[in-house]
C-alpha cells in the first residue's frame, strides 16, 4: 500500500457520459487515457452490456480518438466524432455495431460535433463552428485555409474577450447543420441567414451564444 500520487490522479482513465442503446441493453462510453504529452493521449469508444453479463470491449481504436457517441433509433449504428485519415478537424463518422469499418459522413472545413439522429435514422443533426460572413462551405473553407496559412498565431484583443472555461474562443459561431447518412450527401446549414440574439458580454461587448448549442428532433 502507498499514498496516492499526482501521477495516479492525472493518469487515471476518464469516462464520458454513457450513451444507452434504444433497447437499454448496451452502453457506449468514451474512455480517455491521459498522458503528459497531449499527442500520446488516447480516447476510444467502448461498449458494455448494461446487465454486467460481459466485460467491456473496445469499439474503436485510432490515433485521433473518438467522442460524442449517439445510437441510431434502431440500435444498429453508432454516430461519433473523430479525426481520422488526415482529418484536420473532427468529423462525424457512422459505425455499424454489427461489424465493419466506420464511414465518414461529414467533410466540413469547420468540422462537426454533437451528432443527433433523426427519428427515421436517415439523417444526422450536428453543430459546426462557422466563420463570420461565410455563407457557403466554399467560403468557410477559404477562411479556414487563410487562417492556416498565417505565419503567426498571436491574438490581439482591444477589449476583454469571451472566455469559455479554460480556453479563449475565436470569432467563429456555432451553427446547426443536417445531413443525410448517404453517399455523396451534402450538409445543409439550418441557421444560414439567421441573426443570433446578442447579449451583453465582458467589457460591454456583445456576444452571440458560446461554443455550445443544443438542438433536438421532434418525434
Predicted feature locations:
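Predominantly five- to eight-bladed beta-propeller fold
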Residues: 42-43, 129-182, 187, 191-193
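Short C-terminal beta-strands that terminate individual repeats in beta-propeller domains
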Residues: 58-60, 105
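Hydrophobic beta-strand positions in blades of beta-propellers and related beta-sheet-rich domains
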Residues: 45-47, 92-94, 176-178
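A short helix->beta-strand "capping" segment at the edge of beta-propeller domains
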Residues: 1-15, 56, 187-193, 199-201
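Short glycine/acidic-enriched loop and turn motifs that connect beta-strands
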Residues: 33-37, 83-87, 131-134
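Short loop/turn segments that connect beta-strands within beta-propeller blades
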Residues: 49-54, 96-100, 180-185
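Beta-propeller domains
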Residues: 30-53
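Conserved beta-propeller blade repeats
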Residues: 12-27, 63-81, 102, 109-125, ...
Amino acid at each position: 500500500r502507498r499514498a496516492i500520487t499526482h501521477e495516479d490522479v492525472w493518469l487515471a482513465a476518464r469516462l464520458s457520459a454513457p450513451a444507452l442503446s434504444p433497447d437499454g441493453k448496451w452502453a457506449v462510453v468514451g474512455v480517455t487515457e491521459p498522458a503528459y504529452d497531449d499527442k500520446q493521449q488516447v480516447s476510444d469508444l467502448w461498449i458494455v452490456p448494461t446487465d454486467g453479463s460481459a466485460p467491456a470491449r473496445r469499439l474503436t481504436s485510432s490515433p485521433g480518438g473518438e467522442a460524442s457517441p449517439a445510437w441510431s433509433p434502431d440500435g444498429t449504428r453508432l454516430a461519433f466524432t473523430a479525426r481520422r485519415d488526415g482529418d484536420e478537424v473532427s468529423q462525424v463518422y457512422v459505425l455499424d455495431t454489427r461489424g465493419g469499418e466506420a464511414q465518414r459522413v461529414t467533410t466540413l472545413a469547420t468540422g462537426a460535433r454533437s451528432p443527433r439522429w433523426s427519428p427515421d435514422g436517415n439523417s444526422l443533426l450536428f453543430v459546426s463552428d462557422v466563420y463570420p460572413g461565410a455563407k457557403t462551405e466554399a467560403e468557410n473553407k477559404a477562411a479556414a485555409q487563410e487562417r492556416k496559412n498565417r505565419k503567426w498565431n498571436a491574438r490581439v484583443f482591444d477589449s476583454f474577450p469571451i472566455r469559455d472555461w479554460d480556453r479563449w474562443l475565436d470569432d467563429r459561431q456555432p451553427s446547426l447543420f443536417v445531413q443525410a447518412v448517404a453517399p455523396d450527401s451534402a450538409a445543409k446549414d439550418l441557421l444560414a441567414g439567421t441573426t443570433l440574439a446578442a447579449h451583453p458580454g465582458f467589457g460591454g461587448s456583445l456576444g452571440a451564444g458560446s461554443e455550445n448549442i443544443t438542438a433536438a428532433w421532434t418525434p
